[in-house]
Amino acid sequence: MLEKILIGVAGVLVLFVAVVATRPSAYHVERKLEVAAPADLVFGVLNDLHQFAGVLVLFGSPWEKLDPNMQKTFEGPAAGVGQSYAWSGKEVGKGKMTIEESVPGQKVGMKLEFVEPMESTATCALTLAGTPTGSFVTWSMDGNHNFIGKAFGMFVNMDKMLGTDIEKGLALLKTVAEGR
């Protein structure tokens, strides 16, 4: 009897591993929002991580609320390509974002490096398009899951989880840009 139970458990584990292994590793999450501010103004906030991080701090970032004692450091130029922002905290883990692409008034591309609690990297693009009343901001995030990430994705909707954070970030950006 015990032997049959162990064989059954082993079979379920093998099936689970096989299903996880066949799941796609790449993910893409994207959200858009119209902002009643010109693209150049919005670009200025995004292209300077001091301002971008400041936006999150001043206007109630969910990450700042989660870990108000996290340590933050900035490196590189005053703005644009090469500027980086690193964070470290008990609740938010450890990571770094670096601007890798900067097209004035159009796009800021960043590399995100998550070190703790789970190591991974992702790319983030904030694309701007002018509209008659301001600008349209598209925030996308792309990355690849390792095996554990793919297993986690079977139980958690990554688009919803990451998308909710992106939506909050866009709402904060809108508040700041429209207030300038």
Which ranges hold each PLM region?
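Extracytoplasmic/periplasmic, Sec-exported soluble proteins
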Residues: 34, 44, 87, 91, ...
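Beta-strand/loop substructures that line and gate deep hydrophobic ligand-binding cavities in soluble
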Residues: 98-101, 111-164, 173-175, 179
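Extracytoplasmic/secreted envelope proteins and their assembly/folding machinery
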Residues: 39, 43-52, 82, 96, ...
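Solvent-exposed, flexible loop/coil residues
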Residues: 31, 37-39, 74, 78, ...
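Hydrophobic ligand-binding cavity/cleft-lining segments
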Residues: 4-76
